[in-house]
Amino acid sequence: MANDLFLRACRREPVERPPVWMMRQAGRYLPEYRAVRQRSDFLTMVRTPELAVEVTLQPVDLLAVDAAIIFSDILVVPQAMGMRLSVDDGVGPRFHQPLRAPADFSRLRDVTPEEQLRYVLDALRLARQELNDRVPLIGFAGAPWTLMSYMIEGTGSKSFSQAKRMLVESPASAHELLGRLARTVGEFLIAQVEAGAQAVQLFDSWAGALGPRDFREFALPYLGQAARLARSAGAPVIVFAPGSGWALEEIATVTGADVIGVDWQTDSAEARRRLPASRVALQGNLDPCWLYATPALIRERTREMLEAFGGRSHIANLGHGILPDVPVAHARAFVDSVREWQGP
C-alpha cells in the first residue's frame, strides 16, 4: 500500500507522523460533492455504488487525506430491517412509522448483509478497486443505542424523550431490541471487512443523551457486543461515542477497540493521560468550528492538538463531523498542518 500510515497508527505501530482524515469528509463543504448532489438525492447516492464511490474518493483526490471512508449512512441498517426512511433537504432523516411501543418491534425483519445491504458492500468493493491501494478504506455503522434512538424517535431529537421513555417503561423490550441491533451491526461490519473495508468505525452519535447509569446499562454493553463481533473479522475497530468522554476508560475496556474516538469536548492531553499510547490509539479531536478560523490559526490550533496527543498512537481528526459551510481552503489547512508536522 502506498500510504499505510492510518493502519499502522490503528495498530499502535511507529509512524513518521500522525495520519489524518475527517469525519464527514465526503460532504457538502466540497463543491465537487455538491455537483453530484445536484443531480441525485441523498439516498440514491447512498444506494448507487458508482455515485457513492465518486464522492468517497473526492477528499482523497482533493485534500490528500490518509484514509477514505465509504459514503453511506448509519440509518441504512434500520432501513434494511424494514423501516421506511426519507432524507429531505433542511429536515434531515426521518422514519415514517417510528417504533413507539414494544409491539411495533415485530415489524422488523432480520438482515442478511449481502441481501438487504448489498449496495453498501458493492460500493466498498468498487472503492477498493478505484483506490488501488493509495490509502486505506474505512467502513462504518451506527451503534445500537443510537440506531434505536432514531427508530423510536423517528428523527433526531434534543431530548430523546421517546427513546428514553422506552428504557424506563419497557426495559426488557429495549434490551431485546438493542441485542438484536448489536448482532445485526456486528455482522454488517464483518461483511464490510470481507467486502474490502480495511478498518471499521462504530458511531454512537447519541451516547451523550444518556446519564452514566443508563449509558452503562443500555448503550455500552451493546456497543461492546457490536465492536467485539466486528473485531473477529481481523480489521481495526474504531469506536466514537461523542458526549461520553467521562467514560473513555470503560469504553476502551468493554469494546476492546483498537482506536477510541475523542470528541471536541474532551481535553486532548487528558484523554492521552487516561488512555496511554501503549494501551490504545486515539482519534480526534479538533473542534470542527475552528475550521472557521483563518488558515494560520487553524494551523496553530492543530499543532496544539497534535502536541497534546504526543505524536504516538494518534489519528488526527476533528472532534465531530466537518460542517457543511467550512471553506475548502480551511479544511486543506487542517490536513496540511498535520502532514507537515515534525513531531513534539
Short names for language-model regions:
Residues 41, 102-112, 167-174:
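Short glycine/proline- and acidic residue-enriched helix-loop micro-motifs
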Residues 67, 96-97, 136-138:
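Short, flexible active-site-proximal loops enriched in glycine and acidic residues
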Residues 83-98, 150-163:
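Short, flexible, mixed-charge acidic loops at enzyme active sites
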Residues 1-89, 126, 299, 307-310, ...:
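N-terminal basic, low-complexity leaders that serve as flexible interaction/assembly modules and, when applicable
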Residues 90-130:
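A gly/proline- and charged-residue-enriched helix-loop-helix capping module
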Residues 74-77, 92-93, 102-103, 144-146:
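A short acidic, glycine/proline-enriched capping/turn motif at secondary-structure boundaries
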Residues 116-344:
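Active-site loop segments of alpha/beta catalytic cores
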